[in-house]
Amino acid sequence: MVFENDCRMYEKKYPEENELVMVRIESIGDMGVYVSLLEYNNIEGMILLSEISRRRIRSINKLVRVGKTEAVVVVRVDKDKGYIDLSKRRVTPEEYAQCEERFHKSKAVHGIVRYVATKLSTEDNVVKTKHLYTKFVWPLYTKYGHAYEAFKLSITEPSVFNGFDIAENERKVLMETIIQKLKPQPHKVRADLEITCYDYEGIDAIKHAITASQNHALSVLKAPEDGKFDEKAFGVVTIKLVAPPLYVMVGTFDEKEKGLSMVGQCVDVLSEEITKKNGNLTIKAAPRIVGAVDDQELRDLMEQLEVENQDGDGEEHEDDDDDDDDEEEEEKPKEKKSSRK
């Protein structure tokens, strides 16, 4: 079903031959599989039976399912008749991943544009999605390769929209929507480490190595005006003691790969610095993405260790009391013997 406020995601009306597109399976016929091209306002296309799989087809329902989305490649386009022939079997796993990535970005842009059009519309003036696409979205695709990259960049550089015919109220709603929809999601990265140094100044050596490691992460960040970094800010890496010799290295990042790479670098710096002081670093758990469950497990572990430490202190005091009682018991028989004399 095509809604009044719907519009294709790209400027050209039809895809080009050899272009990867994302489709939804609509029905299965005698000649092939009928699909709708999601990026092109759901226009119809067909995957011929011979283009579904490289293998012999025994049951077509096992290869395609109505309602499922698939990445396919355009084989032929007849713009006069509106025919679009597609192939599923010619798409490699790498191309499939590329198509999915582009579609998810395009879908995010489309959702933002539709929402902005709805917010700007009134009873007297309906703003159509295509109107916004024509004014600035399609030109952004041309300039930045993908409008998603331009939208994401505008969060820190609003000047991205300079030069486009965008009214002030349109720009305000657009920026608010982009910030709400595309604001980076935090990814927490953690590594579990054992750090030891038995030299005379071992504690100072560990402190120095930790500081050097944390400063490595800060070196690539833009310092705030007051010069103080919030440990929860993106890119800041902190190292905390759980219980000697166990430490955890934690950082929050806007991109997973960037976070894993930076924490890995900080581990290397820490290892290098502590080795210089005749210390040792053992990686108990390599840098990885962690969530709320992992955080809770860490808190539980720290609480357990704290309780064990307290119990240990209490047992030492009890042992001291027992020793005193034993001494008193040993003294009492001696007093009795002396009284008999």
Swiss-Prot record:
Keywords: Cytoplasm, Initiation factor, Protein biosynthesis, RNA-binding, Translation regulation. Residues 303-330 have a biased composition (Acidic residues). The keyword Transferase does not apply. The gene is eif2s1. Residues 18-89 form the S1 motif domain. The lineage of its organism: Eukaryota, Amoebozoa, Evosea, Eumycetozoa, Dictyostelia. This is Eukaryotic translation initiation factor 2 subunit 1. Pfam families: EIF_2_alpha, S1. Residues 331-341 have a biased composition (Basic and acidic residues). PANTHER family: EUKARYOTIC TRANSLATION INITIATION FACTOR 2 SUBUNIT 1. One of its GO terms (molecular function) is translation initiation factor activity. GO terms for biological process: regulation of translation; translational initiation. Residues 301-341 are annotated as: Disordered. Disulfide bonds: none annotated. Belongs to the eIF-2-alpha family. eIF-2 functions in the early steps of protein synthesis by forming a ternary complex with GTP and initiator tRNA. This complex binds to a 40S ribosomal subunit, followed by mRNA binding to form a 43S pre-initiation complex. Junction of the 60S ribosomal subunit to form the 80S initiation complex is preceded by hydrolysis of the GTP bound to eIF-2 and release of an eIF-2-GDP binary complex. In order for eIF-2 to recycle and catalyze another round of initiation, the GDP bound to eIF-2 must exchange with GTP by way of a reaction catalyzed by eIF2B. SUPFAM superfamilies: eIF-2-alpha, C-terminal domain, eIF2alpha middle domain-like, Nucleic acid-binding proteins. Eukaryotic translation initiation factor 2 eIF2 is a heterotrimeric complex composed of an alpha, a beta and a gamma subunit. It is found in: Cytoplasm, Cytosol. GO terms for cellular component: cytosol; eukaryotic 48S preinitiation complex; eukaryotic translation initiation factor 2 complex.
